[in-house]
């Protein structure tokens, strides 16, 4: 994310404005209400939730990803996350999905049904160390899963 993008985004957790870094480390258990305002300028979400080991559930249904090109390691190490619905993600510009869910060992179901992967050049290790996730529990739009595990 460049400086211009940072100026156009705002993140609030439990209505408290927080600075944008790699977002926020959800290491403490509890319920968080997260509100994003990125004004459609977000181009990278890589490492956004990386290391959020206590994150169990997140609703990203209104998260605008139309200009995102890099989603690598976005949920890296989110070991408590169990289900994730990313069917609202708009991904035609994404080129990098490397390690997106790496280490999400509790993840059991994943909806990627609207993922457009036509421009993706790197999907390596996308589901690496997702020991609870089975291929049949990943909803995709007919793209083939091979080197992602």
What is each PLM-predicted segment?
Residues 1-149:
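Negatively charged
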């Amino acid at each position: 994310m460049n400086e211009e993008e940072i100026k156009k985004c705002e993140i609030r957790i439990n209505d408290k404005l927080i600075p944008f870094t790699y977002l926020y480390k959800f290491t403490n258990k509890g319920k968080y209400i997260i509100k994003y305002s990125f004004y459609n300028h977000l181009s990278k979400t890589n490492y956004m939730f990386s290391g959020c080991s206590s994150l169990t559930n997140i609703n990203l249904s209104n998260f605008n990803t139309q200009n995102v090109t890099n989603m690598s390691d976005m949920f890296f190490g989110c070991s408590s996350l169990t289900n994730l619905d990313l069917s609202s993600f708009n991904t035609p510009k994404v080129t990098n999905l490397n390690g997106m869910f790496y280490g999400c060992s509790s993840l059991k179901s994943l909806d990627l049904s609207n993922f457009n992967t036509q421009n993706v050049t790197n999907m390596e290790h996308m589901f690496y160390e997702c020991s609870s996730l089975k291929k049949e529990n990943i909803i995709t739009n007919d793209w083939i899963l091979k080197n992602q595990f």
